[in-house]
Every structure is written in structure tokens, then in C-alpha cells.
Amino acid sequence: MKLFQQMLVAGATLSLLAPIAAQASDIVNIEEMNSYSRSKKKKTPRFDHKTFANDFSDVSNNKGDINGLEVQRNQFEAGTFSETTTMDGKAVMWAGAVDGGNEFGGSEDTQTGYTFTMNLNTSFSGDDNLYVRLKTGEQGDQWKNKYTYHIETKDNSDLLEVDKMWYTFPLGEKVTAFVGPRIENYYMYITPSIYKPGALKSFKLGGNSNFGASTDVGYGLKYELDNGIGFATNVVDKGADEGEGWFAPGNAIKWDSQIAYTTDRWHVSGTLSNARNWSAHDYNATTMGRQVARDSIGYALRAYWMPEETGTTVPEISVGYDTKSYGGVFTAGNTTQANSYMVGFTWKDMIQADDRIGIAFTQPLSATEVQGGGDTGEVGAQVWEAYYSFRPNDSMEITPAIFGGNDIAADEDDDIFGLLVTSKFKF
């Protein structure tokens, strides 16, 4: 008999024997009670100096045991988190392939990837919070390529590292301040988009031409009123913890300021992004969109709307538009202006509770003007994705997705089609 069958038989047998065992247990208990009652009638208590000495010795031994347990408890508590520290984690695994990957230096083979994340939050006053995120991951080359960059990609060769760290504290009732050696500027915004990508980072935050890839030393403020108006500003310096120090001339620095209005069902916001020596804007960009000066002024407009009820044919809608102007461009034919846009639709609770259907389209950051005038060379790049995400239980999420694009780099032949399955485990 196989092990699984033996387990089934054993379980069934135990379930049949349980009532009999319970009845037998009742009989024994009644008999023990009768025996105890008879013994009370036949015996009289007896107490002398030997009994006292023995009982006193037992008490002393028990006290010693209690003291030993107290020491062990203190040692145990010394090795645990404080009562104000919480930890949660997430493991993500995926596998997929991209047809056409060889056209932009990727691979058409089936490749996998994973990330493992641990989040620690500690409050010292009840109103503040120290956030630390530890993360590791590794993935195939096609999930690191900027054209097909997976939404969960973390490329640090299996090393568990400090990925985020900042301290948040209130300044009065409406203002929140934050400072840290590893802040991410968009974590400090009023949420600009509610579309959650199912495959590609290109769709994150409503398009990330002005957002993202900014983790480093920084600080900022966020001001939110009860009427829905909010303002956020922060600065990140990627060279502050290196030899040149804070705000050194050669450092990559990014300063973002956002103003937003948010209600229960819709949101609009505008963000000004001032970047110096900055190049981390190419997760959703064409070849011309990447070949830009390192100093820029960018504007990001975002909006979203959601229906009153989920489970209907009316989706949530998220839109984004980004434009960038580059300074210090002197070479003829180099990009001086570029823009991008994104539209995302989400249907929730359509087949089962907590599921999600997502469809999104984006034009990657593309050149609209070049130094000296003339043709930009852009051919109308487009990228799209579609996915279905469902939860087998409260801690798991499975997301099969397809995605594709045409002319994603610069040539009319740069077309791709991909598919993958992503699994998330939260704990």
C-alpha cells in the first residue's frame, strides 16, 4: 500500500476510533472519581516533621526551576525583535521566454528569475517608523534587458543586501519627514497610479520616464491635507556616501516635487523632476530616448479613476504622460526633447474574489526634437501587456501574462512577443 493510501486509511481509522476512545475515557474518569471519594473516607491526613522537611525541599527545588526558566526567558527575549518591530516577507519566482529577443541583444530561450525580500518596520514613538528592506535575486539576461525588464527583477547575484533604509517621522499633524541612506523617491509620493504591472517594469507608476531607479542617500517632506490636496518633495544623491561627498559636482542628483489632489475614486497629480548627471531613465525608452544628455528637466502628469464597485465590466483606468527637456546638447542629431505615455486598465473580482485582469499600453520615451532640427529617427515604438492574476489563498498569487511590442528600439524590425508566469508567496 502506498504511503498516501496508508495515510488516508490511518486517518479514517482514527476518526472511527475517536468516539469509542472518548466513551472509554469517560468511564475511566468516573471510576477515578469514585476511587478518590472512597479514599477520602478511609484515610486521614497525617503531617509530621519529616513531611514538612520533604515539602520544603520540594518548594526550594521548584523555586530553582523557576529561576532557571526566568534566565532562559531573558536569553530568548534578548535574541528576538523588540515588541515594536514587525517583519514580513515575499518570495517571487517566474519563468518565461521572449520571441524576438535576439534582435536587441537578448535571448529567445526560456529563462527564469527570482527575488526574495524581507521588510522590517520599527516604531520608537508610535508615530515614527524605521524601514529596512533586505533583498536578493537573480534572473536570466532577458529579464535584465531594459526593453523586457521584469517588474520584480533584482540583479545582485544571489547576495542578500540592504535594498532600502529610511526613517520617517511627523512634523506636526500634516507633514511627514523622511531621511535615510537608501531612500526611493517614489515611495515618498502621493500614489500617482493604481495600475499594477503583471510583467514589465515599463508600466510601473504610470510609466517611469521621470520616476524610479533612484535608490540612494536622500531626504524629503510630504504634506497632506484632509481635503485631498497633497505636496511632496525629495532629493536623492547617488554620490553622497562616496569620496566626493554630498552634492559634489560630479554626483548624480535627482530632485522631485509633486502636487496632487486625491479623492476616494480619482486622482490627478503633476511632478517636476530636476536631474543632474542622471542616466537612470531608460527602463522604458527607445534607442534615441536613451541617447540623451545627463542633465534634464522633466514633467510627469498622472491620473486615475476607479468605479464604485468591482466585479463589473467597467475597469479602473490609469493614465500617464511624461516629457523631458535636456540641457547641454551641442552635437547635431542628439535628442533635446522626448516624451512618453501610458494607459492601463484593471478589472477586479471578475472570476473570483481578489483576482485582477490587467491590460496596458505605452509609448516608450521617444525623441521628439534633436539638436539642429531634422528627423528624429523614431518609428512609433509601442509596448503592451495583458495578464490575469489570482490568489489560490491569502498568501499566494499566480500571474500568467503575455506582452509584446513593435519597433521597441529604433528599427522597424525590433518586434517582440513574450509570455511568462510569475508566482508570489507572502509571509
PLM ranges: what are they?
Residues G126-L130, K174-A177, N227-T233, R265-G270, ...:
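Repeated loop/turn-to-beta-strand initiation elements of outer-membrane beta-barrel proteins
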Residues K222, T233-T310, T323-G328:
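Membrane-embedded translocation segments of transport machinery
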Residues T84, K90, G105-A240, I259-T262, ...:
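Outer membrane beta-barrel
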Residues K2-F104:
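N-terminal periplasmic/intermembrane-space "pro-region" immediately following the signal or transit peptide
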Residues D415-F427:
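Outer-membrane beta-barrel "beta-signal"
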Residues N67-S82, T117-G126, P170-V175, L225-N227, ...:
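Outer-membrane beta-barrel proteins
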Residues W94-G100, Q139-D141, Y186-M188, V236-W246, ...:
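Sequence/structural signature of outer-membrane beta-barrel proteins
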